[in-house]
Curated annotation (Swiss-Prot):
UniProt lineage: Archaea, Methanobacteriati, Methanobacteriota, Stenosarchaea group, Halobacteria
Keyword Oxidoreductase annotated: no
The keyword Metal-binding appears for this protein: no
Entry function: Flagellin is the subunit protein which polymerizes to form the filaments of archaeal flagella.
Organism: Natrialba magadii (strain ATCC 43099 / DSM 3394 / CCM 3739 / CIP 104546 / IAM 13178 / JCM 8861 / NBRC 102185 / NCIMB 2190 / MS3)
Protein name: Flagellin B4
Propeptide: 1-11
């Protein structure tokens, strides 16, 4: 009277279902791989952006002072000089708080001045001497405006010898420094950038010329002077930019004085 129930039914999966399952697993694996690669790329980009942001902060240059030295050259009224002019522009620079070493030889100064615009790079005075015949950065002339065939000690050069397209760097002793020494670090907490106001884009003297500014023709050869303005962007090697505005007073009261720009 007992009934023995047996079940011979078994679960079966169709081949189509199995194919779909395998396909889903493969798609999930591919998607996971894509997500992992994307996450890695985003992490790398984030790290690179973080490093760039850090460099922009750690390699920023501070401009501490901006002064101009009034030329002591006397020009008569017959020469057409109806206003003062500068013989050099001096920018005191230092590394911003917490900054790393900053190489001024790799720094660019973008200038918009009365005579146009230009990108200035550092002029290296060389190891021991500056040769007047090099296509370099310092031109030495005699009293008659002729190119001096001899060479001169780098520390004896003055700002009027800096060609357009360049700037010089001066240490605390008042001497031009070489590229290897133009570094803002613990030893050089502050250096001075020297600009020549006679050459473009500050003045109108032609950069290729080997002659000094002709003070007898100020109508066509004008130096940066009273009432002039110029905008500077000092770009460090990392790309950090410091903006500096130069505004000369409308009147220079005394030759040889230092005026705030």
């Amino acid at each position: 009277m007992f009934v023995n129930e047996t079940t011979d039914d078994r679960g079966q999966v169709g081949i189509g279902t199995l194919i779909v399952f395998i396909a889903m697993v493969l798609v999930a694996a591919i998607a996971a791989g894509v997500l992992i690669n994307t996450a890695g790329m985003l992490q790398s980009q984030a790290e690179a952006t973080g490093e760039e942001s850090t460099d922009l902060v750690s390699e920023r240059i501070d401009s501490t002072t901006a002064v101009g030295i009034v030329s002591e050259t006397e020009v008569s009224e017959e020469a057409g000089a109806d206003r003062g002019e500068l013989e050099e522009i001096r920018l005191g620079v230092s590394g911003a708080a917490g900054s790393d070493n900053i190489d001024l030889s790799e720094t660019i100064i973008q200038v918009v001045g009365p005579q146009g615009q230009d990108n200035l790079v550092m002029a290296d005075p060389g190891d021991d001497e500056i040769d007047a015949n090099d296509d370099g950065f310092v031109t030495v002339t005699d009293e008659d405006g002729n190119v001096d065939g001899d060479s001169t000690d780098a520390t004896d050069a003055d700002p009027s010898h800096i060609a357009s397209g360049h700037f010089a760097v001066e240490n605390e002793d008042g001497n031009f420094v070489e590229e290897s020494d133009a570094v803002l670090d613990n030893d050089n907490g502050e250096l001075t950038i020297i600009l020549n106001p006679k050459v473009a884009p500050f003045g109108s003297q032609i950069s290729e010329s080997d002659e000094e500014l002709d003070l007898q023709d100020l109508d066509t050869e004008d130096a940066f002077g009273a009432g002039d303005e110029s905008s500077l962007s000092i770009v460090s090697p990392s790309g950090a930019t410091t903006e500096v505005e130069l505004n000369a007073p409308d009147l220079f009261s005394e030759d040889g004085e230092a005026v705030r720009l």
